[in-house]
Regions:
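Hydrophobic core segments of alpha-helical transmembrane domains in multi-pass membrane transport
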Residues: 12-21, 50-55, 150-154
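Hydrophobic alpha-helical transmembrane segments
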Residues: 7-11, 43, 47-48, 75-79, ...
Length: 175
């Protein structure tokens, strides 16, 4: 019964999709096709990232990561987060396993939040697209405000959350 409760949201969405298909067949099939394409995208994107996370876990020593992204890393933490998030490719859900590994290895919460923010606003493909579509002024304002915002959010998160508390948190217990 606990396993069924854990997947209740999946079953609710599946039943909703079936009901939608009975009400409006073309819309239901379109939703099913979109869902299938999203699942396929995830299946192609996640395995390489999980392999990368596993290799990073084995190759990068905790002390090295703490030196560059730990509490006392200073400008190195900002630069490393900018580099790691800026050269990234793919949707944000790809960044979460990397962020969890960084947290486990001793990276500061401030730099993890900043890394996730850089991933969403200032990764290279987004910057190139914004420069070509929206121009220099918009892009620089958007990225500048985004980076400042996410760094400040990282400072706030660091004040309210303990690293050990986040490492012990298990989201599946709430399901």
């Amino acid at each position: 019964m606990k396993e069924l409760k854990r997947y209740r949201f999946f079953f609710i969405l599946l039943i909703g999709l079936i009901i939608l298909t009975f009400i409006n067949q073309s819309l239901g099939w379109s939703a099913l096709q979109l869902t299938g394409n999203s699942i396929l995208d995830m299946l192609f994107l996640l395995p390489p990232v999980l392999i990368f996370v596993g290799l990073l876990d084995q190759w990068v020593k905790k002390e090295t990561l703490m030196k560059y992204m730990g509490e006392k890393s200073g400008i190195y933490g900002i630069l490393f987060s900018l580099l790691l998030g800026g050269i990234a490719a793919g949707p944000l859900y790809i960044a979460f396993p990397i962020a969890a590994l960084l947290l486990k290895k001793g990276a500061s919460i401030r730099y993890i939040v900043f890394f996730l923010g850089v991933w969403t606003t200032a990764k290279l493909p987004i910057i190139v697209y914004e420069f070509s579509s929206f121009g220099t002024t918009f892009t620089l304002i958007h990225i500048g405000f985004g980076l400042v915002f996410f760094y400040v959010m990282g400072l706030i998160f660091e004040r309210f959350y303990d690293q050990g508390q986040l490492l012990r948190y298990d989201v599946t217990e709430e399901m």
